[in-house]
From Swiss-Prot:
Similarity section: Belongs to the universal ribosomal protein uL10 family.
GO biological process: translation
Protein name: Large ribosomal subunit protein uL10
Protein's gene: rplJ
Subunit structure: Part of the ribosomal stalk of the 50S ribosomal subunit. The N-terminus interacts with L11 and the large rRNA to form the base of the stalk. The C-terminus forms an elongated spine to which L12 dimers bind in a sequential fashion forming a multimeric L10(L12)X complex.
Pfam families, per database record: Ribosomal_L10
Function: Forms part of the ribosomal stalk, playing a central role in the interaction of the ribosome with GTP-bound translation factors.
Chain segments annotated as transmembrane: none
Origin organism lineage: Bacteria, Pseudomonadati, Pseudomonadota, Acidithiobacillia, Acidithiobacillales
C-alpha cells in the first residue's frame, strides 16, 4: 500500500515530534514475527511509554535528519521496527526481553545521547535499574540523615520517660 505525499509528510512530522521528546531510539529486524507476537510486543511497549512503529526507511531517514538521532541513518536497511522513548532503560529492557523470547526479533542498534549504540550496549543498558528504582534509592538516601536525626531527637524524651518509670518502680518497691 503506497502512501500519498500528504500522508508521508504527516508520518515524518509525527515521527519528528516523537523524536524531540525521545532520549533514545532502537531499530530491530522483525522479519518472521507473527502478527500476534507483534501485537503483544506493541502492547507491552505502550504500557512502558515506548513508541513502536514500522515505518519506511526513507521516511524515517527524513524524520531523523537534523536531529541527534541522524547518526543511525546507515542502520536503516531492510524491514525494521523503530522505537523511541523518553526512558532509555525501559526501551532497552523491552527490546532485550523480547529479543530473548522471540528469536526473530534481532536488535540492530540505536542511539543514546546522540551516540550510536550497538546491540551489546543496549543489552548492558537493559541491566541498569529503572528510573523509578533510581528515584526510590535517591529518596531513601536523602531521607536517611533526616530520619536518623528524628530518632536521635526522639531518644531524649524516651530516655527521660524510662528513667522516670524506673524511679517510680523503685519507690513503689
Amino acid at each position: 500500500m503506497s502512501l500519498k505525499l500528504a500522508e508521508k509528510e504527516q508520518v515524518v512530522a509525527t515521527l519528528q515530534t516523537r523524536l524531540t521528546r525521545a532520549q533514545a531510539t532502537v531499530v530491530a529486524e522483525y522479519r518472521g514475527l507473527t502478527v500476534a507476537q507483534m501485537t503483544v510486543f506493541r502492547a507491552e511497549a505502550q504500557k512502558q511509554s515506548v513508541h513502536v512503529q514500522v515505518v519506511k526507511n526513507t521516511l524515517l531517514k527524513r524524520a531523523l535528519a537534523g536531529t541527534p538521532f541522524a547518526v543511525m541513518d546507515h542502520l536503516l536497511k531492510g524491514p525494521l521496527v523503530f522505537a523511541a522513548a523518553e526512558d532509555p532503560v525501559a526501551l532497552a529492557k523491552l527490546f532485550t526481553d523480547h529479543a530473548k523470547r522471540l528469536e526473530k526479533l534481532v536488535i540492530i542498534g540505536g542511539v543514546l545521547s546522540g551516540k550510536q549504540i550497538d546491540a551489546a550496549a543496549i543489552a548492558q543498558l537493559s541491566k541498569m535499574p529503572s528510573r523509578e528504582e533510581l528515584l526510590a534509592k535517591l529518596l531513601g538516601t536523602m531521607q536517611a540523615p533526616v530520619a536518623g536525626f528524628v530518632r536521635t531527637l526522639n531518644e531524649v524524651p524516651s530516655r527521660f520517660v524510662r528513667t522516670l518509670a524506673a524511679v517510680r518502680d523503685q519507690r513503689a518497691a
